[in-house]
Amino acid sequence: MTIIYYFANQKNYLVCGTGNKSEILIGYFTKHGDGACDMEPIGDLYKTEVYRLSEFLNIQEEIIKKPPRAGLWENQTDEDEIGMSYNLLDQILYLYTERDMENTKIAEKLEISADDVDMIIEKIARSEHKSKVPEFPKKTTL
């Protein structure tokens, strides 16, 4: 990222990220790695919406159908690492973050275990620090 920012700075450019809403909400990115950017053009689109946008834009089907993967190790896929499909993840995220639905109600509605919903909600909570300005000490007066 340092090199990318070096060249962006030389030309007064911004660094564009590739994160989508699904990845951002659960913290599926490296804080100062792939998450380091000045803007996220698809940051308010769930992964399933990114797929629909790709189809609308006539992106090659071979690209759309390729399983998302960070490429961290051989045969690694995002969905295996997350623990569920993006389709299910996005439904949970939508109901929890945009409809303020309770865990048990989400599980009922989607006919899944409450443990799966809890796992995602925990990912959201554990990664909250990734989307915030770092903490710093406050000045005090004597």
Regions inferred by a protein language model and the residue ranges of each:
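ATP/NTP-dependent adenylation/nucleotidyl-transfer catalytic domains that generate, transfer
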Residues: 2-142
